[in-house]
């Protein structure tokens, strides 16, 4: 069983989910289905208990006393699921039939009401006596003047009842009362009452009838069994709708209850049953087969009390909010329900426990769901389900999703209820509903024995649902009182929190996670979370009160609850749980005093609260823990939260950050602070993390690609991505000065970061190039010329070096532009010139995109590691190395990194290790030629390149602005003289200021590498250079240049922006000089072959790159259909690139 316990639990859990979904879709689901007369309900009922039992007991329990085999369990589950499906289909059919019947009955009722109304009006107008109509209506006789209004009101009520029955269908009405989850129970309990209401005399006996297994719960289900089922089929939306409708539902329920089920006893039960019998709404229609006469009786009864009904309905519809109506009906129904139902005796402890659990769950249940999402779900999936079976499982499921889905009323209600008594009441139903779920979950979890015991005992089909409803009603009332008290306490606490907001905000955020972590324990330990809640605000700095803090946290976190709850589900919670719990345990107990002494008392440290108030407050709260711990833990937590939030929100936050990149760093910080509560706190410290950003932004911004644009600002980048590491530090310090200092530091760091990023990016690019080279070699080994052309593309990647040129913001903007332009130009060039064709040959689509991305700084590396190395093999591998080595002045260092990455390329390896240029030549040549060969390309395509490519992309995109233009300008040059564009002279001029001077050496080698990479293509690329020296020396010198450090010069040219850097960006900008054998060789002023070989790969790379100075010829040759075009065509043909 141990082996199968988990599968059984999982399978059962899945079946539970399926069953719960099916059952919920089946109308009230669990209990309703179980209550259904069909034998299939028995299967679902056993299904849920079995599922719960199996899940709870770890397998043997439930449907299968013993799980001998996983297949057996699965088969049983399948059978049960099939049975549920069949039952669902049957219910749907019955529902449709019943719906038609109901429509007919409703029409009849409407017609009869209308006729009666006309008759009454005629009598009133003629005789002015409404008494004659219903001699049994003394009140109406006395109220002949108001009979018209009464009739009209009755018509209105019946219409509303019809609409609501049609729209919400009574089964959901009851569900709504107990909560979204209660749909499982409420339909059942409704059906129970409906059954009882079948003989409405029994309604007086409802307490005794409640235990009825709802043998007739489907008596209405028979008419409308599928109504709840179908509605539960749409159970979640139905519940939501019903929740929205619940306000009306009481009204509906009143007339509905009065419509049929209460017909006989309606006069007797009017006040009670009206409130109690929202459950009976379905019976209206069900019994309404004889509804005309019954409705006449009902209406006579209603007419008897017509004034009261009018008042009630008018008040309900007009004066009383739907929430209040729900509360009234729920409370009254619950009150009567509790006394009426003798079984609540067992439920009463549960309701109390559940009330306590619920009261905390109202605060903590959300915490259960949020932090306890693992816990709450296990609890929901555990014995609670087994005991409560479907009823519990569904509420727990509904309540559990409520946490992930803040929109779900239970969670929101639970969360909000502590916040606002009205919401607490309005949710009052919903929180009790989740309360039921929590009763089931927390009660089942914490009170598992009592919850499962009493619940299991009442678990008789209807009784458990009704009991749950009763418990829900009691709990709702209690929860409302608790929530009101808690809310009052929370209000006080909130005031205290407002005072302590800065501390509490962080505390709450952390504790929201922590309490979410602890909350599952909290509810049982502190049934009344409110009491502790009061204490929490008293000493918000007292983190030990994680549970208490959560309640206040919930209202303050109301806005953040979704995020926090979502974050609770996110890995952050784990980190936050880890960080926060230990912080709460150790730092709270130890740091409470210290915190109070440290920063809790020194709120002035949070003098930046104006902007950082939220941020600073959490830092202050963190200081409550420890001056350092808050920073470290906050940074960790905030980083985690920010990273998670960013990861969660990355699509929007990067967008936000993209524009932020254009914003001033301070504005970015403010925006980030404002936009992100959690982020804001770390943002408070954002200035300090700038260093961390420098380090992390390389990784973090990479992860959040667009983040890089904001990262270069440092503050923005930090806030967005890297800030999580350091953001916490600024909190207590004057952020204005710190921010300035941080900006300065960040700027200085940004350079370092860029270097680091380039190193990382180069590594990533090398990995990507290697990976791509491997893939491309495999694809292109049959297409050597394409490989050559692909290397030509590598000059595109060379532009990636430009990433460093522009400001991160500019680069970010340039990235998109350069990416688009590079994609367009690169694709045009790919079509026009073999360059792009080369990229496609390696990764036809990738190179086309890579050309575009090469400007972006990513695709060129990732997409065409081989061609990119070929073009500027360094651009992918060497460019990274060159860029970074240029920054660090060590091309070999990165080349060595690439060397191991490109070790597969024997030449490239030696070259790489020997020289970054060798790397480029190797990657370019080996990637190009070996890519043809496959081993080198394989070595080059290593996955390391892509990460750097990505990271480089961010940076390249930054540099893309300058090289954007030249890449755009040079892109056509690239395609024709692709190396020219890759010189990125335009972009590298921007980078020229950046530490890329060493790249000056590389550009020549890069041009060579381009030639090498494009042995044939380089000739076309650098027809002159190739014609000159590279053509002959390309193959031979490729090996030599590959083995030579010359490749570094090739890299410099390969990253023409690098020579553009060192020397004339204009020349680099020039497509012909793009590879700067001319421009860079001007810098190095060597013959293309000489420069290449002299510069590190003078022969192989230099030869080809000398062609780059001849980029015009190369462009002409390529444009004129040189081998580049042919390669492009072949690549396009191979890869189907347009």
UniProtKB/Swiss-Prot annotation:
Record has Transmembrane as a keyword: no
Matches recorded under Gene3D superfamilies: 6.10.250.970
Gene Ontology CC terms, in alphabetical order: nuclear speck; nucleoplasm; nucleus
Chain intervals with Low complexity compositional bias: 395-411, 467-480, 633-649
InterPro entries in alphabetical order: MAML1-3, MAML1_3_TAD1, MAML1_3_TAD2, MAML_N_sf, Mastermind-like_N
GO MF terms, alphabetically ordered: transcription coactivator activity
A biological process from GO: positive regulation of transcription by RNA polymerase II
Compositionally biased spans, kind Gly residues: 52-64
Keyword Transcription: yes
Residue numbers spanned by region Disordered: 37-68, 119-148, 169-188, 207-237, 334-480, 503-547, 615-662, 691-721, 968-991, 1024-1084, 1090-1109
Biased composition range(s): Polar residues: 37-48, 130-139, 173-188, 343-359, 372-394, 414-426, 1064-1084
Notes on the domains: The C-terminal domain is required for transcriptional activation.
Entry's family note: Belongs to the mastermind family.
Protein name: Mastermind-like protein 3
């Amino acid at each position: 069983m141990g082996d199968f316990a988990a599968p059984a639990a999982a399978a059962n859990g899945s079946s539970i989910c399926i069953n719960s979904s099916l059952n919920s879709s089946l109308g009230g689901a669990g209990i309703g289905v179980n209550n259904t007369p069909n034998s299939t309900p028995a299967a679902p009922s056993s299904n849920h208990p079995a599922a719960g039992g199996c899940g709870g007991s770890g397998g043997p329990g439930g449907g299968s006393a013993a799980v001998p085999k996983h297949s057996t369990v699965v088969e049983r589950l399948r059978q049960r699921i099939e049975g549920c499906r069949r039952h669902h289909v049957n219910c749907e059919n019955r529902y449709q039939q019943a719906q038609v019947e109901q429509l007919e009955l409703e029409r009849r009722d409407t017609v009869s009401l209308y006729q009666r109304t006309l008759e009454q009006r005629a009598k009133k107008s003629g005789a002015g006596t409404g008494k004659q109509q219903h001699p049994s209506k003394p009140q109406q006789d006395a109220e002949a003047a108001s009979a018209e209004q009464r009739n009209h009101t009755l018509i209105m009520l019946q219409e509303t009842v019809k609409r609501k029955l049609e729209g919400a269908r009574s089964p959901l009405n009851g569900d709504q009362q107990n909560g979204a989850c209660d749909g499982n129970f409420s339909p059942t309990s409704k059906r129970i009452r409906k059954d009882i209401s079948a003989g409405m005399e029994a309604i007086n006996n409802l307490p005794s009838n409640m235990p009825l297994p709802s043998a007739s719960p489907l008596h209405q289900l028979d008419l409308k069994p599928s109504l709840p089922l179908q509605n539960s089929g749409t159970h979640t939306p139905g519940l939501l709708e019903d929740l929205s409708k619940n306000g009306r539902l009481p009204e509906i329920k009143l007339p509905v209850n009065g419509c049929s089920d209460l017909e006989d006893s309606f006069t007797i039960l009017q006040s009670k049953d009206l409130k109690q019998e929202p459950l009976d709404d379905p019976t209206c229609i069900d019994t309404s087969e004889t509804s005309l006469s019954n409705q006449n009786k009902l209406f006579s009864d209603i007419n008897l009390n017509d004034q009261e009904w009018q008042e009630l309905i008018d008040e309900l519809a007009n004066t009383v909010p739907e929430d209040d109506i729900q509360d009234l009906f729920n409370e009254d129904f619950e009150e009567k329900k509790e006394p009426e139902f003798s079984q609540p005796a067992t439920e009463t402890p549960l309701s109390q426990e559940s009330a306590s659990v619920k009261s905390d769950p109202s605060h903590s249940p959300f915490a259960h769901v949020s932090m306890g999402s693992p816990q709450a779900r296990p609890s929901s999936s555990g014995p609670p389900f087994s005991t409560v079976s479907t009823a519990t499982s569904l509420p727990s499921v509904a309540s559990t999703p409520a946490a992930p889905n803040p929109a779900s009323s239970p969670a929101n209600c639970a969360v909000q209820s502590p916040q606002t008594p009205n919401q607490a009441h309005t949710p009052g139903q919903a929180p009790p509903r989740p309360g039921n779920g929590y009763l089931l979950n927390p009660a089942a979890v914490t009170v598992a024995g009592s919850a499962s015991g009493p619940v299991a005992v009442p678990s008789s089909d209807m009784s458990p649902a009704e009991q749950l409803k009763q418990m829900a009603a009691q709990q709702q009332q209690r929860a409302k009182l608790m929530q009101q008290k808690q809310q009052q306490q929370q209000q006080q606490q909130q005031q205290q929190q407002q005072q302590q907001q800065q501390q509490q905000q962080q505390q709450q955020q952390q504790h929201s996670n922590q309490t979410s972590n602890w909350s599952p324990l909290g509810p049982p330990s502190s049934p009344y979370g409110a009491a502790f809640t009061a204490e929490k605000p008293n000493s918000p700095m007292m983190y030990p009160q994680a549970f208490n803090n959560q309640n206040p946290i919930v209202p303050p976190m109301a806005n953040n609850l979704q995020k926090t709850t979502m974050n609770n589900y996110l890995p952050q919670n784990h980190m936050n749980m880890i960080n926060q719990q230990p912080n709460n345990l150790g730092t709270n107990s130890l740091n409470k005093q210290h915190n109070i002494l440290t920063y809790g008392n020194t709120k002035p440290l949070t003098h930046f609260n104006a902007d950082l108030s939220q941020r600073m407050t959490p830092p202050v709260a963190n200081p409550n823990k420890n001056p350092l711990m808050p920073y470290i833990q906050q940074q960790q937590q905030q980083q985690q939260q920010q990273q998670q939030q960013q990861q969660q929100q990355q699509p929007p936050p990067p967008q936000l950050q993209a524009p932020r990149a254009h914003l001033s760093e301070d504005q970015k910080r403010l925006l980030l602070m404002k936009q992100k509560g959690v982020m804001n706190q770390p943002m408070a410290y954002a200035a300090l993390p700038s260093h961390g950003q420098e380090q992390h932004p390389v990784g973090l911004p990479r992860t959040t690609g667009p983040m890089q644009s904001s990262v270069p600002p440092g503050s923005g980048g930090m806030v967005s991505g890297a800030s999580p590491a350091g953001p916490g530090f600024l909190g207590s310090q004057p952020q204005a000065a710190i921010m300035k200092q941080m900006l300065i530091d960040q700027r200085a760091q940004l350079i370092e970061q860029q270097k680091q990023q380039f190193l990382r990016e180069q590594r990533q690019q090398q990995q990507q190039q290697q990976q791509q080279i491997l893939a491309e070699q495999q694809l292109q080994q049959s297409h050597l010329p394409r490989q050559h052309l692909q290397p030509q593309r590598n000059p595109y990647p060379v532009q990636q070096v430009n990433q460093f040129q522009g400001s991160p913001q500019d680069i970010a903007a340039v990235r998109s532009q350069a990416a688009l332009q590079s994609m367009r130009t690169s694709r045009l060039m790919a079509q026009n010139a073999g360059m792009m064709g080369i990229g496609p040959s390696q990764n036809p689509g990738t190179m086309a995109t890579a050309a575009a991305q090469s400007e972006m700084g990513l695709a060129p590396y990732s997409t065409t590691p081989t061609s990119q190395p070929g073009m500027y093999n360094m651009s992918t591998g060497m460019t990274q190395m060159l860029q970074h080595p240029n920054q660090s002045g060590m091309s070999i260092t990165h080349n060595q990194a690439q060397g191991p990455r490109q070790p597969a390329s024997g030449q490239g390896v030696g070259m790489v290790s020997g020289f970054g240029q060798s790397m480029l030549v190797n990657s370019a040549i080996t990637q190009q030629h070996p890519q043809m060969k496959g081993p080198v390309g394989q070595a080059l395509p290593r996955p390391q390149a892509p990460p750097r490519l990505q990271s480089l992309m961010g940076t390249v995109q930054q540099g893309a602005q300058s090289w954007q233009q030249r890449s755009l300008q040079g892109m056509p040059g690239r395609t024709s003289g692709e190396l020219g564009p890759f010189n990125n002279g335009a972009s590298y001029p921007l980078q020229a200021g950046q530490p890329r001077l060493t790249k000056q050496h590389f550009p020549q080698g890069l041009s060579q590498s381009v030639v090498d990479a494009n042995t044939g293509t380089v000739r076309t690329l650098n027809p002159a250079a190739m014609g000159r020296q590279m053509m002959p020396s390309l193959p031979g010198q490729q090996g030599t240049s590959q083995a030579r450090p010359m490749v570094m010069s090739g890299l410099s040219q390969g990253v023409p922006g690098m020579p553009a850097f060192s020397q004339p960006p204009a020349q680099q900008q020039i497509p012909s000089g793009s590879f700067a054998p001319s421009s860079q060789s001007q810098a190095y002023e060597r013959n293309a072959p000489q420069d290449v070989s002299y510069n590190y790969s003078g022969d192989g790379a230099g030869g080809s790159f000398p062609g780059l100075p001849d980029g015009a010829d190369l462009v002409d040759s390529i444009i004129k259909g040189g081998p580049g075009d042919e390669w492009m065509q072949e690549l396009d043909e191979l890869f189907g690139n347009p």
